[in-house]
Amino acid sequence: MIVSPCIAPRIPGTRLRKAMLAGVALVGLLSAGQLWAFNLDDVAAKAKDLAGQKYEAPKSNLPPVFRDMKYADYQKIRFLQEKAEWAKDKTPFKLSFYHQGMHFDTPVTINEITANKVEEIKYDPSRFEFGDVPHDADATKNLGYAGFRVLYPINKADKQDEIMTLLGASYFRVVGKGHRYGLSARGLAIDTALPSGEEFPRFREFWIEKPKPKDKHLVIYALLDSPRSTGAYKLTLRPGEDTLVDVKSRVYLRDNVSRLGIAPLTSMYLFGPNQPSKVMNYRPALHDSEGLSIHAGNGEWLWRPLNNPKHLAVSNFSVENPRGFGLLQRQRDFSDYEDLDDEYEKRPSTWIEPKGDWGKGTVDLVEIPTADETNDNIVAFWSPEKLPEVGKPFEYDYRLRWTIKEDQLHSPELGWVKQTLRSTGDVKQSNLIRQADGTVAFLVDFIGPNLATLPADTAVRSQVSVGDNAEVVENNLRYNPETKGWRLTLRLKVQDPKKATEMRAALLRDVPVEAPKPAKDSKQDKAAAKHAHAKAEKAKAEQPAEQPAADAASTNGTPATTEKVLTETWSYQLPADE
């Protein structure tokens, strides 16, 4: 019923004022709730709107003194920790900021989400100490930040340590307790390693939820933008011995792409035992990651040692609904690197755990030649078989695990590769002197709890396959008492050194097939068997006495066996021109 104003019931003045005040309070609560409820949908709406517009490249507002500076000068610009965001608040998380400089020459917008507002964190030059770098505070007061760091007392309760950094394109790095910064993750990769050139989407704006005093996680939203893509991301950071980042993404394409990289990782590999340094170096290895690990949807585990090739190398591993993949640093002893400054043994592995089914696609590995360790030359990502349509959202959710405890990433039922050693192939002559024979040798150590429990004389065998560019001249498997595992030695004769050579190996053993347990007979089966037995006894009684009964057949066959896979699959590519 519509009530006409002229017949509406009269409300006393006091009650009317109370009702109006209650209404105002309710509106205030709803408004605060709506702001506090800022979520991925809000960022996705911005991404969708951007996708319908023409791309505008970010404009640099950086004075030449900052844009043209060298790395050493950029390092002189120091953020003052006492001026960190939330420095005086009781929250365990704090934020510090990167100043613009060098190639970090475009600002990003950084917002804070609180219980009652969303507000930009403005650039403030007083938060920095510039050393002897000349600058005009008035001319740069609206400069903007290049990125930010997340601080958290991960190692000591009274010390704020960097645990996450977001700087440049869509890159971010994360560490756990006792880690050193190593490899990076990215929001999205487009046309990586294609002749047309790679496109690097960038996070242009961030929204960070101010955490409560007892919160153990930090929520960061990010808006992605590039000539052919836009996207909304939610990153939930959970620091600990292993630091986790839960990623929710909703991406739109502005235009078609040839190769899409989901959950991309970027790392560095210069040399290691499987590809020793060409120049004499006291370090046995120098890398942020040493191999790509893949857990396929069918349960198979694969390990691919990394290379620093002379030519660009791209490998594609077909996988349907991957259970996980990542770039790992398995060698964890100081003696593996012998570097007091860079501590490569403390650099984390990063493991990606997809949420839901990702369908058919490939895990792609890109290896780029590099002459030194300052260049990230390794990229790994998931590439879907079916590319999304332009303008339609696609979502990929996953967890990033940053860890130095790689044994947690292995199946307890399978062994894994501890190390891959490469050497010039040789043979021992009658005088016991070894002589090179023109082959290349690989020694692969497989270890794991399942192998350690096997007696040394267990009949373990190798299953080896190589491409058509090599011939296997030795395939030798021995028990390794030092590791309580098995060492596989392969010597290969490469046909054409100008071509790459693929090889795979895994360890197997034969185990008896368990006979199926007989099913219990039902009452009907027992009755039928009793009737058949009585009928047989009657027929036997009617036979002539001189007719002998038939002898039972004897069996001398060996027990049936089946192959049991004992290890992950070692998959290696010997680069061309080596």
UniProtKB/Swiss-Prot annotation:
Pathway: Glycan metabolism; osmoregulated periplasmic glucan (OPG) biosynthesis. Pfam families: MdoG. Residues 511-578 are annotated as: Disordered. Keywords: Periplasm, Signal. Residues 1-37 form the signal peptide. Its main location: periplasm. One of its GO terms (biological process) is beta-glucan biosynthetic process. GO terms for molecular function: carbohydrate binding; catalytic activity. Residues 544-554 have a biased composition (Low complexity). InterPro entries: Gal_mutarotase_sf_dom (IPR011013), GH-type_carb-bd (IPR014718), Glucan_biosyn_MdoG/MdoD (IPR014438), Glucan_biosyn_MdoG_C (IPR007444), Ig-like_fold (IPR013783), Ig_E-set (IPR014756), MdoG_OpgG (IPR023704). GO terms for cellular component: outer membrane-bounded periplasmic space. It is found in: Periplasm. Transmembrane segments: none annotated. Residues 517-543 have a biased composition (Basic and acidic residues). Belongs to the OpgD/OpgG family. Involved in the biosynthesis of osmoregulated periplasmic glucans (OPGs). This is Glucans biosynthesis protein G. It comes from Pseudomonas entomophila (strain L48).
